Curated annotation (Swiss-Prot):
Pfam families: Cytochrom_C_asm
Name listed for the protein in its UniProt record: Cytochrome c biogenesis protein CcsA
Function field: Required during biogenesis of c-type cytochromes (cytochrome c6 and cytochrome f) at the step of heme attachment.
Lineage of producing organism: Eukaryota, Viridiplantae, Streptophyta, Embryophyta, Tracheophyta
Source species: Lepidium virginicum (Virginia pepperweed)
Family, as annotated: Belongs to the CcmF/CycK/Ccl1/NrfE/CcsA family.
Subcellular location: Plastid, Chloroplast thylakoid membrane
Amino acid sequence: MIFSILEHILTHISFSVVSIVLTIYFLTLVVNLDEIIGFFDSSDKGIVITFFGITGLLFTRWIYSGHFPLSNLYESLIFLSWAFSIIHMVSYFNKKHKNHLNAITAPSAIFIQGFATSGLLNKMPQSAILVPALQSQWLMMHVSMMILGYGALLCGSLLSIALLVITFRKVRPTFWKKNIKTKFLLNELFSFDVLYYINERNSILLQQNSNFSFSRNYYRYQLIEQLDFWSFRIISFGFIFLTVGILSGAVWANETWGSYWNWDPKETWAFITWTIFAIYLHIKTNRNVRGINSAIVASIGFLLIWICYFGVNLLGIGLHSYGSFTPN
C-alpha cells in the first residue's frame, strides 16, 4: 500500500515538473526571454528533477510489483522517457554541446513522459502478475537493451532530421542587424533591388575573405557539423544496444518457444530497423558521401522505430501481443 501511494506521488511529481518545463520551452519559442538570466536553464534543471523522479518511480514499481518494470506499454514508455533523460543529463553536464543536444532530448522526454502519465493509458499503470512468457531472467536484459536502443536511435534520428531541416532551409540574405529602425532607414535610402544586390555581394565576400567565421553561413555550417557528429555517435550507441537486445531476445525466444527466430511482426520490424541503421553506419564509413545522405536514411529509421515500437501494440497480434494497448 505504501509503495502504491509512493508510486502515485512520484508519477504526479514527474508529470507536474514535465508540464512546467514544457511551458518554459513553449515560452522560449514565442517570447524573447534572453534578458531573464537563468530562465532557460531552469528547464534543464527541471529535466534533471524529472530524471530522479522517474528513477524513483521505476524502483518503486519494481519493488511493488516484484518484477522489473518493463512488462507493458506504460512501463516501457516510462523507461523510454528515462532513457531520454539520461541522454539529456549527459549533454547537461557537457557544457560545450549542451544547446545542441538538449533541444532534442528535453522535448522528447517531456512528451513521452507526459503521454505515459496523462491518463491516456489508464488501464496500463496498474501493476499485474507477469504472463508466463515474461517470467524469465531475460526480461531485464532483452527489453531494457531494446528500449535503450530505441531511445538512442530516436534521439540520433531527430538530430539527423534537424540537420536536414537546417540544410534545406532557405536563408534570407541579410547583412544588417535585425533592427526595425535600421531597416526603415535603409528602405528609405535604397530600393529593394539595390539592397538585394548588396546583400548577395556581401554574402560572397564574406565567404571569400578571412572573416568568414563571422558570417551566418559559417555558424550554420558549424551547427550542421555538430548535428552530424552527435547523430552518428548516438546512433552508434543505439545500434549496439539494439543489436544486444535482438540477440538476447533470440536466446530468450529459443528457451521459451523453441526457436531463435519466428518472424513475428515485432521481430520482423526490429530486423528491418536494424538493417536501416546498419546501412546508415555503412554510409558513414564512406568519407566521400555527404552527411545529407546518411541523415535521410536515419530519418527513415525514425519512422521504422515507431512502427516497430507501436505497430504490434496497436494491432495486438503476434507473439509480442502482451504489450498491446489493451492488456490481456
